[in-house]
Amino acid sequence: MSRNIIPKTTYQEIMLSGHPMIDVRAPIEFDKGAFPSSSNFPLMQDSERQRVGTCYKEQGQDAAIALGHSLVNGKVKQQRVDAWLAFIKQHPDAYLYCFRGGLRSQLSQQWIKEAGVDIPYVEGGYKAMRQYLIEVIDNAPAKQPVFILSGITGSGKTDFLLQRSEAVDLEGYAHHRGSSFGRYHEGQPTQINFENQLAVALLKHQERKEQCLLVEDESFLIGRSAIPKAFYEGMQNADILVLEEPEETRLTRLLNEYVHKMHSGYVERLGEEAGFTAFSEYLSQSITSIKKRLGSQLHDEFQTIISKALNMQLQQNDTQGHLEWISLLLTRYYDPMYQYQLEQKQERVIFKGSHQAMHEWLDHYRNR
């Protein structure tokens, strides 16, 4: 029987277009990592998959297939098919995939076809598409010149990146600002999902035929998200552009990021009282995370200042008290650390300037 299969040669088009896909793997597989445009409608739930897997190891493929059919039949089977059909009704051009493009894809496709709809499955499945995206990341630094956007904390690197088509926002895909105060309310993606989003962004960047690739100066770890090794090594050899901003501007920006945005985010999710409590814990835990570097005495000083600022905010609805600890954080922690790190790679710095000057430099490079 001939099958409706999407070949491996279309992986680039699938990722660039954000083609809707049905992932028929079990939820435990999907939760570890999937593709940005995929939705999980499993052929088997986790417990069913585990039983079939055990049967396969002990009794072989035929017995495992028979067990799978016995577990997913009747009303259960109809519920699975109905879920697929509902998705296909919303996305008539959908593809489906399993782990390797094997039995689960073929069986799902067959059941959908028996219901009157013929949709293709992706050759090679999740495993092959995932490998393709890994190769996209590994090869990206060699595709075009890479520039690293550096700058002292609060200089607005992310704001700048979001205005540039040459840029890929690593922190955005990691969902973390890359510092002790960098976490967001919602948490970070899995490592696989971080990498998959990065790969798709790089594909789109290459499709635009940009003159260079601009990324922020990052450590190997952005929160708990690790930059893929080959890509990170490419960053270590790239020229550096340093963004410069006045201290007052930096303080205002960090007050907005660390205090206003985080507080409002927690309140939006948890309500006024619980949100303020969670916000307070976020500030305290962020300082505690760098206690070893600060030393106990300075750490305790920070906690005291933060506590006073939180009390002022709670009692008077005034956030200006937070500027004291933010200023101290810059002068006693971030700024010395940044200056030391920049000195280690000073020979790679090719330009320093304000936001406007940096835009002009990159525009000139792009149009040269």
Swiss-Prot record:
Domain Rhodanese as annotated: residue spans: 15-138
GO biological process, one term: tRNA wobble uridine modification
The EC number(s) this enzyme carries: 2.9.1.3
SUPFAM superfamilies: Rhodanese/Cell cycle control phosphatase
Gene3D superfamilies: Rhodanese-like domain
Catalyses which reaction(s): 5-methylaminomethyl-2-thiouridine(34) in tRNA + selenophosphate + (2E)-geranyl diphosphate + H2O + H(+) = 5-methylaminomethyl-2-selenouridine(34) in tRNA + (2E)-thiogeraniol + phosphate + diphosphate; 5-methylaminomethyl-2-thiouridine(34) in tRNA + (2E)-geranyl diphosphate = 5-methylaminomethyl-S-(2E)-geranyl-thiouridine(34) in tRNA + diphosphate; 5-methylaminomethyl-S-(2E)-geranyl-thiouridine(34) in tRNA + selenophosphate + H(+) = 5-methylaminomethyl-2-(Se-phospho)selenouridine(34) in tRNA + (2E)-thiogeraniol; 5-methylaminomethyl-2-(Se-phospho)selenouridine(34) in tRNA + H2O = 5-methylaminomethyl-2-selenouridine(34) in tRNA + phosphate
InterPro entries the UniProt entry points to: Rhodanese-like_dom, Rhodanese-like_dom_sf, SelU
Keyword Transferase among record annotations: yes
Keywords, alphabetical: Selenium, Transferase
GO MF terms, alphabetically ordered: transferase activity, transferring alkyl or aryl (other than methyl) groups; tRNA 2-selenouridine synthase activity
Active site positions: C98
Superkingdom as given in the UniProt entry: Bacteria
Database matches in NCBIfam families: PRK11784.1-2 (NF008750), PRK11784.1-3 (NF008751), tRNA_sel_U_synt (TIGR03167)
Protein family according to the UniProt entry: Belongs to the SelU family.
Role according to the record: Involved in the post-transcriptional modification of the uridine at the wobble position (U34) of tRNA(Lys), tRNA(Glu) and tRNA(Gln). Catalyzes the conversion of 2-thiouridine (S2U-RNA) to 2-selenouridine (Se2U-RNA). Acts in a two-step process involving geranylation of 2-thiouridine (S2U) to S-geranyl-2-thiouridine (geS2U) and subsequent selenation of the latter derivative to 2-selenouridine (Se2U) in the tRNA chain.
Binding partners and assembly: Monomer.
Name this polypeptide is given: tRNA 2-selenouridine synthase
Name of the coding gene: selU
